[in-house]
Swiss-Prot record:
One of its GO terms (molecular function) is efflux transmembrane transporter activity. Gene3D superfamilies: 2.40.30.170, 2.40.420.20, 2.40.50.100, Helix hairpin bin. It comes from Escherichia coli O6:K15:H31 (strain 536 / UPEC). GO terms for cellular component: efflux pump complex; plasma membrane. This is Multidrug resistance protein MdtA. The MdtABC tripartite complex confers resistance against novobiocin and deoxycholate. Induction: The mdtABC operon is transcriptionally activated by BaeR. The gene is mdtA. Residues 399-415 have a biased composition (Basic and acidic residues). It is found in: Cell inner membrane. Part of a tripartite efflux system composed of MdtA, MdtB and MdtC. It holds the Pfam family HlyD_D23. Its main location: membrane. Belongs to the membrane fusion protein (MFP) (TC 8.A.1) family. Residues 31-56, 392-415 are annotated as: Disordered.
Amino acid sequence: MKGSYKSRWVIVIVVVIAAIAAFWFWQGRNDSQSAAPGATKQAQQSPAGGRRGMRAGPLAPVQAATAVEQAVPRYLTGLGTITAANTVTVRSRVDGQLMALHFQEGQQVKAGDLLAEIDPSQFKVALAQAQGQLAKDKATLANARRDLARYQQLAKTNLVSRQELDAQQALVSETEGTIKADEASVASAQLQLDWSRITAPVDGRVGLKQVDVGNQISSGDTTGIVVITQTHPIDLVFTLPESDIATVVQAQKAGKPLVVEAWDRTNSKKLSEGTLLSLDNQIDATTGTIKVKARFNNQDDALFPNQFVNARMLVDTEQNAVVIPTAALQMGNEGHFVWVLNSENKVSKHLVTPGIQDSQKVVIRAGISAGDRVVTDGIDRLTEGAKVEVVEAQSATTPEEKATSREYAKKGARS
């Protein structure tokens, strides 16, 4: 009985072992059939391909760029507003009825162009009266001078007294004074008549008219007839931090005009290029900034008064600078660093000293050299000494994207 009992247990154990072996055989066959051909081939080519769990994982894909040596312009940037070089409110200098306007709203005018006319009738009358009085007094003077000549002859023979001669001399002098006053009155009346024709005091663009024809206007009107803004040239007033003052002053001492660029509100389109005109004479204590004025020819009317723009002033150009994409520059506990690729596509961390930069590129003053390859994308997957796969970045495919890329390359860097 005891031998048969043991035999039954042996049979049970053998059956269990056979079942387990059959299960593992079936499971391994399914894994083999479901494996991708590429993965199978990679496993066969791998030195450890015959051992489960020892196959190497795929390399981390990254994008890279080469550090280049180039001249990098240094810009100071600020926000500003376009202002007219001159703004003039055209007012009448005499009182009267507005008879005519000789401009179109928004028109460009030259200094001296006729803008408006006031009824000249009263001024013509006043001029005629002054001229008449002058003629009358000139006749009186001529008569007084003739009498004086006679008195002088009679005085020689004592036919007139010395007192009478002096009185006649005084009359002549008085009449001469009257003549000068009359001449001034004529000039004043002529000036009043001239002022009835209102002309442009400066070159510029006229705005909207402030008064209609037929209205009575006076020299005391505050609104005036029209406002002229001088836009050729035109100015840009922007602010810089007080820390930039020394840089601007040093650049001015070089003797060359400092170029100032005006960019649109989104800082994506260059509107015009001018030169630095002046610095303000004091710092705004509230904001810690100083006002700067630049002047633009604006012959294409790209700039308009009160327009908001981004200002960029070129103060220096750094020659032979090592430049990399800004995306490659990282910040860690030890400071700024970049991941550098060697010839085997293995990465290593290099501490660097950055210089001037913008959103596209950064100058590296120390830590790498021109020709070094740095990782620009896929940085979060990197570890020291890891081998990576370098893939190409997706390039600009449309003309607009290419143009934008070229424009960023021209814009340079800022401090």
